[in-house]
């Protein structure tokens, strides 16, 4: 895990809120028409609506979180769904405990 990229991704309050929201997506984001949020993840449009962000800003934020390895993207047709990468988040927490 690249700690610097992870910290940069989490330094933005909206990205941090998105990652926190993905921990309990059913409570944090509006219901979506397709897919199970626990299995498939949360659609970008639901994240956008739940956060009150533009589509382009939401896509950019999710790209940053994805490059940092904190979320996993799954493409289904024209939709992209995101879930937390729990393994990477645990590695980040462990690294904070040992490296800082």
Region locations from a protein language model:
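Short, Lys/Arg-enriched N-terminal segment that forms or immediately precedes the first helix
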Residues: 1-7
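Base-recognition residues in the alpha-helical recognition helix of bacterial helix-turn-helix
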Residues: 59-61, 78
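Beta-hairpin "wing" of winged helix-turn-helix
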Residues: 67-76, 83
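Short, charged/polar, Gly/Pro-enriched secondary-structure boundary elements
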Residues: 88-92
């Amino acid at each position: 895990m690249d700690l610097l990229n992870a910290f940069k991704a989490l330094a933005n309050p909206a990205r941090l809120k998105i990652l926190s929201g993905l921990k309990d997506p059913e409570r944090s984001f509006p219901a979506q028409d397709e897919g199970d949020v626990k299995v498939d993840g949360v659609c970008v449009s639901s994240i956008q609506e739940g956060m009150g962000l533009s589509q382009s800003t939401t896509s950019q934020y999710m790209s940053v979180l994805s490059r940092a390895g904190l979320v996993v993207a799954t493409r289904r047709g024209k939709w992209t769904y995101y879930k937390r990468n729990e393994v990477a988040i645990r590695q980040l927490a462990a690294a904070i405990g040992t490296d800082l």
